[in-house]
């Protein structure tokens, strides 16, 4: 197909600059407006993908009442430990941390990630009551427990999670109650709930403009000169510089992305129920609880994924479909 007079540009500028994420732990920039008391997110590890058969419950679908195929993602959900509480106040430049309190007894593995100073150790929960009038938001500092999974590491990830509730006093009472305790995913989410997934995508390394931006491959003399996979024109003579909008080669993948309105199909506590023959590729067996999410989730195996309550939940027109089968066949190719 030849060049048209008008056509959309190749690739999207929405996520520019396309560079590597700073951290493997995704940064959560927004939270659901939920009045339910409890945590609004939960960190998990991606085990792998498989497929399931669901009973179609859309009455207008030609497959209504029949089994339909759907890809599903299995995420391992080891318990998280609540290590601290942080109170935020409102300023002209946004939220500012007023004070924080750490649990007296900490997991020794947390020392691999951070060190709680003596100044912070002596603070008690009464210091949170002292700034209650100035507090507008309350969050807890939790860490994962990867040593209980098949992932070969002990160093935990630390995530800050917002506490939901109708009032600050209600949030504070809940945060005090869970300080120093471990929580499971059943304390945060339930089957059938819509969630958002936040994670860093698979890294692809340095890629050319054809794969990175989707520019057209040039034929004829361009192919003979060996420049068929390069951008045809990188801009005019003036201004004497290359615009940032020009599709060029560079980093592809390893970006933080958020996918909205994934649905929890199943929550389980025994990993053997969901582990396929031979284990998941590059992961192994699921040893803790798990969650089965409809569709795919960004990132490779072993990647930390934060499940957040849906910030713009979809309308649940037909309810949760019945799951009749989840494949446990070998993913090893034999």
Swiss-Prot record:
<dbReference type="GO" id="GO:0003735">
    <property type="term" value="F:structural constituent of ribosome"/>
</dbReference>
<dbReference type="InterPro" id="IPR009000">
    <property type="entry name" value="Transl_B-barrel_sf"/>
</dbReference>
<keyword id="KW-0689">Ribosomal protein</keyword>
<dbReference type="GO" id="GO:0022625">
    <property type="term" value="C:cytosolic large ribosomal subunit"/>
</dbReference>
<dbReference type="InterPro" id="IPR045077">
    <property type="entry name" value="L3_arc_euk"/>
</dbReference>
<protein>
    <recommendedName>
        <fullName>Large ribosomal subunit protein uL3</fullName>
    </recommendedName>
</protein>
<dbReference type="GO" id="GO:0006412">
    <property type="term" value="P:translation"/>
</dbReference>
<feature type="compositionally biased region" description="Basic residues">
    <location>
        <begin position="1"/>
        <end position="10"/>
    </location>
</feature>
<comment type="similarity">
    <text>Belongs to the universal ribosomal protein uL3 family.</text>
</comment>
<dbReference type="Pfam" id="PF00297">
    <property type="entry name" value="Ribosomal_L3"/>
</dbReference>
<keyword id="KW-0694">RNA-binding</keyword>
<comment type="subunit">
    <text>Part of the 50S ribosomal subunit. Forms a cluster with proteins L14 and L24e.</text>
</comment>
<dbReference type="InterPro" id="IPR019928">
    <property type="entry name" value="Ribosomal_uL3_arc"/>
</dbReference>
<dbReference type="InterPro" id="IPR019926">
    <property type="entry name" value="Ribosomal_uL3_CS"/>
</dbReference>
<keyword id="KW-0699">rRNA-binding</keyword>
<keyword id="KW-0687">Ribonucleoprotein</keyword>
<comment type="function">
    <text>One of the primary rRNA binding proteins, it binds directly near the 3'-end of the 23S rRNA, where it nucleates assembly of the 50S subunit.</text>
</comment>
<dbReference type="GO" id="GO:0019843">
    <property type="term" value="F:rRNA binding"/>
</dbReference>
<dbReference type="InterPro" id="IPR000597">
    <property type="entry name" value="Ribosomal_uL3"/>
</dbReference>
<dbReference type="InterPro" id="IPR044892">
    <property type="entry name" value="Ribosomal_L3_dom_3_arc_sf"/>
</dbReference>
<feature type="region of interest" description="Disordered">
    <location>
        <begin position="1"/>
        <end position="21"/>
    </location>
</feature>
